[in-house]
């Protein structure tokens, strides 16, 4: 790395950190238990890591996004991500790194406008460390646990509420959570009295895990099948 490039990166990080420090007046605890100072009001954000942009889209905060990872700009014959289909404008945004959380601090610092906060779903074995990313960019990095609608539902809800608080979408976060809970309850109510012998046998293919996979990618404990009391072939092939 040449000296001018190092100087450019250092100066940008310093200037961004000054702006973040001046306006950071709200301290939050993120998904990794880190205490993070974030601006009280945020207009621009980016989402890093698997599923992160999906959660932000649930909150209808898509207009705040100023950059995406390279996954969002890829064109395929079939896109299995409903949020991306609903918002094709993501494809036109600047790229700040590679998918699965492999961010590029230099590209982040060239985004215009600059993000006030970086949301990041994080796994220790994959992607840029949130603390290191924050140190190199001077931008608050809020780590999130993606969770699911099964045993990790509380983590999903906590992440939605945290994102909602930072983006000013608290009411929307609660509406999304209420929708999930009401729908799950209704599905269970409708199917709980179906005799065991009459319950359908089903299989789910093409499950995405930290990115898209083929048809044979499945989930033995797929929560929606559990909600309707269906027999999941991947869980009980007999």
Question: Can you name each region flagged by the protein language model?
Answer:
Residues 46-48, 66-69, 116-121, 141-145, ...:
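Structural recognition of the beta-strand scaffold that forms the well-ordered cores
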Residues 28, 35, 134-211, 231-235:
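Extracytoplasmic substrate-binding proteins
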Residues 213-238:
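Alpha-helical, coiled-coil/dimerization segments enriched in small aliphatic residues
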Residues 20-24:
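Sec/Tat signal peptide C-region and signal peptidase I cleavage site
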Residues 51-54, 71-74, 123-126, 147-152, ...:
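Solvent-exposed loop/turn segments at secondary-structure junctions
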Residues 7-18:
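Bacterial N-terminal signal peptides
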Residues 32-60, 208:
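Conserved H-X4-D acyltransferase segment
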Residues 49, 53-112, 116-123, 230-233:
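A short, structured surface patch at a secondary-structure boundary
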